[in-house]
Amino acid sequence: MALLSLQQISLRFGGPLLLDKVDLQLERAERVCLIGRNGEGKSTLLKLINGELIPDSGEIARQKGLCTAYLSQEIPRELDGTVYEIVQDGLENADRSQVKRDIHNDWEKRHQVEKVISLMELDADAEFKVLSCGLKRRVLLAKGLVCKPEILLLDEPTNHLDIASIDWLEEFLLRYEGTVFFVTHDRVFLKNIARRIIELDRGNLVDWECDYETFLTRKQAVLDAEEKQWSTFDKKLAKEEVWLRQGI
């Protein structure tokens, strides 16, 4: 059974449909990249999966007790406190239905927070506001991971990161046992992480069911076929125009 299933989902914000009766299934332990042009609605789809938005029509089926964590493109400017406080906040403010049964009492919560901070190689007592951009993103990732999510949603996770921070993130995600669904314009990161490519194009989702290199080959073949089809059509149209000018 899929962790999450989108069935005939449609959504618009006043203009054209961002999502037009799309279907999507996410399975356990997948690493999926969502690609598409700017403004296509990629971030919107991530927020739908995270439960922040409600579709105009269609159904989102979630496995019982499913927990998702969402890391947005931007770092909140107003966020303040120590690393420990911010990560703990991710547990305290989570929907109770999404908090795993093994982390309910105070000792279990404290242990889980400390465990995630250690896993992310962070200093629990460090002040968030003085950290580098890379470490701030790592803290926000820890805040999401503290609830043990089955699906990790990442929106441009390498934005403003230095090479060392990107390398660390790649290594972490390759070890991560949950499902990762992410958006990125970083082609090297995409190639290293994704094992499944989904393309959002004019409201429609195309599941290429392959890694990035295979996607490039298949996509080029599709574009070549379309170009050939249009070339044939143009030649036919040109012949018809000549025929019309001859008055036959």
Language model features with spans:
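Charged, low-complexity surface segments at secondary-structure and domain boundaries
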Residues: 99-101, 245-248
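Short cytosolic helices in intracellular loops of multi-pass membrane proteins
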Residues: 231-247
